[in-house]
């Protein structure tokens, strides 16, 4: 499988720790997508991104220096 996921039951927190500093895509439950460099993620899936961009309906809406995303809004995180 892609992005470090496998059928052998890999720990998601280990995967997230490995991609700190890497470019990621974060999709929210609302369908909004953020792309940026993963700065941190906590046990509640709260996410901090650097050099982030917000995409709505596939179109760039806004660019941010830093973005903080509340974990209960996150549908998935994908390493780019």
From Swiss-Prot:
UniProt-listed PROSITE patterns: SM
Major site of localization recorded for this protein: cytoplasm
UniProt KW RNA-binding keyword: yes
Keyword entries, A-Z: Cytoplasm, mRNA processing, mRNA splicing, Nucleus, Ribonucleoprotein, RNA-binding, rRNA processing, Spliceosome, tRNA processing
Pfam families named among the record's database cross-references: LSM
GO BP term (any one): deadenylation-dependent decapping of nuclear-transcribed mRNA
Subcellular location(s) of the protein: Cytoplasm; Nucleus
CC per GO annotation: Lsm1-7-Pat1 complex; nucleolus; P-body; sno(s)RNA-containing ribonucleoprotein complex; spliceosomal complex; U4/U6 x U5 tri-snRNP complex; U6 snRNP
Molecular function, one GO term: RNA binding
Taxonomy, superkingdom: Eukaryota
Residues covered by the Sm domain: 11-80
Database matches in InterPro entries: Lsm6/sSmF, LSM_dom_sf, Sm, Sm_dom_euk/arc
Function: Component of LSm protein complexes, which are involved in RNA processing and may function in a chaperone-like manner, facilitating the efficient association of RNA processing factors with their substrates. Component of the cytoplasmic LSM1-LSM7 complex, which is thought to be involved in mRNA degradation by activating the decapping step in the 5'-to-3' mRNA decay pathway. Component of the nuclear LSM2-LSM8 complex, which is involved in splicing of nuclear mRNAs.
Quaternary structure note: Component of the heptameric LSM1-LSM7 complex, which consists of lsm1, lsm2, lsm3, lsm4, lsm5, lsm6 and lsm7. Component of the heptameric LSM2-LSM8 complex, which consists of lsm2, lsm3, lsm4, lsm5, lsm6, lsm7 and lsm8. The LSm subunits form a seven-membered ring structure with a doughnut shape.
UniProt record similarity statement: Belongs to the snRNP Sm proteins family. SmF/LSm6 subfamily.
Protein name as it appears in the record: U6 snRNA-associated Sm-like protein LSm6
Organism field: Neosartorya fischeri (strain ATCC 1020 / DSM 3700 / CBS 544.65 / FGSC A1164 / JCM 1740 / NRRL 181 / WB 181) (Aspergillus fischerianus)
